[in-house]
Structures are given as structure tokens and as C-alpha cells.
Design a protein with these regions (language model features):
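Double-stranded beta-helix
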Residues: 3, 7-11, 19, 75-77, ...
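A generic "binding-loop/recognition-motif" signal
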Residues: 46, 55-56, 97, 106
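Glycine- and acidic-residue-biased ligand/ion/polar-headgroup-sensing regions
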Residues: 55-74
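Conserved short histidine dyad/triad with adjacent acidic residue
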Residues: 38-54
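Short acidic-glycine-tyrosine-enriched beta hairpin
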Residues: 73-96
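Conserved hydrophobic/aromatic beta-strand scaffold that supports enzyme active sites
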Residues: 39-41, 59, 90-92
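Short beta-strand His + acidic residue motifs that chelate non-heme Fe in jelly-roll/DSBH
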Residues: 49-51, 69-70, 91-93, 99-104, ...
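A short, N-terminal "cap"/entry segment at the start of jelly-roll beta-barrel domains
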Residues: 1-35, 80-84, 129
Length: 129
């Protein structure tokens, strides 16, 4: 599969039409894959809760647009905001890092990769502040 402008535009259109202002495309071969590879289209105004992954590090690359990767401490204090643009930073978040994302430009799409099959966030993995 070539991830071209048409695919990115279609994913962005779905994100814009979604009440959550985001949409993802699963790039795995099957649910049995032992890794996750997901394209995420995120629009300004989408709310991603501060969360962590206790079983995997997470690698994040900006494919198109502009966003900030937000890193927090365990009580919800913002520790770092990392500017993400295509050809810029690539992030590898260690296991257990509290983080979120803020979209700064319409049409933003990122690639997120992590170990293991998809698991919804558990109660203790979403920071309540």
C-alpha cells in the first residue's frame, strides 16, 4: 500500500466529519499482529486524554500538518511540549510516559507505532485532573 495524498485526504475528511475530530486507519495485517501501526488524522479542537501505555513504548512521526506532543508528570503538570512537523522530530516515548497530543493545523496526520495488540486504555492509564 502506498500512503498517498488521496488516502491522507480521505482520512482527514473522516476526521473533520467525526464529532471527536479525529479518525484512525489501522495498518496492521490482522488483529493477531503483535505490533500496532496506526495513521491518526487529528483536527484542531480534538480532545485526547492524558494517558500512558504500561506495556509498550510509543513511536510517533508527523506525516502531514503540525501538532504538539505533550508530556506530563504523574500529577498532570505539563513537563514538555514537543513541536512536530513533517521532516522534524520523531518521538519515542518510554513505557509509562504520560502524554497527549494537540493538533495545531487542519489536515494533520501522524503515524503511531507500538508493541502488542490494541488494548483500550484501562482506568489507571488515563490521568484524571
Amino acid at each position: 500500500m502506498v500512503i498517498d495524498k488521496q488516502i491522507l485526504d480521505e482520512l482527514t475528511a473522516q476526521a473533520k466529519a467525526s464529532p471527536r475530530l479525529r479518525m484512525n486507519m489501522d495498518l496492521r495485517n490482522s488483529q493477531a499482529d503483535l505490533s500496532q501501526r496506526i495513521l491518526n488524522a487529528i483536527e484542531p479542537g480534538t480532545v485526547l486524554p492524558i494517558h500512558r501505555h504500561l506495556n509498550s513504548s510509543v513511536t510517533i512521526v508527523c506525516i502531514r500538518g503540525h501538532f504538539e506532543e505533550l508530556i506530563y508528570d504523574e500529577i498532570g503538570t505539563l513537563v514538555e511540549a514537543i513541536d512536530m512537523i513533517p521532516g522534524g522530530n520523531v518521538i519515542n516515548l518510554p513505557i509509562g510516559t504520560w502524554h497527549s497530543i494537540r493538533s495545531l493545523e487542519s489536515g494533520t496526520v501522524l503515524l503511531e507505532c507500538q508493541d502488542g495488540p490494541y488494548e483500550p486504555h484501562k482506568e489507571g492509564d488515563v490521568l484524571k485532573i
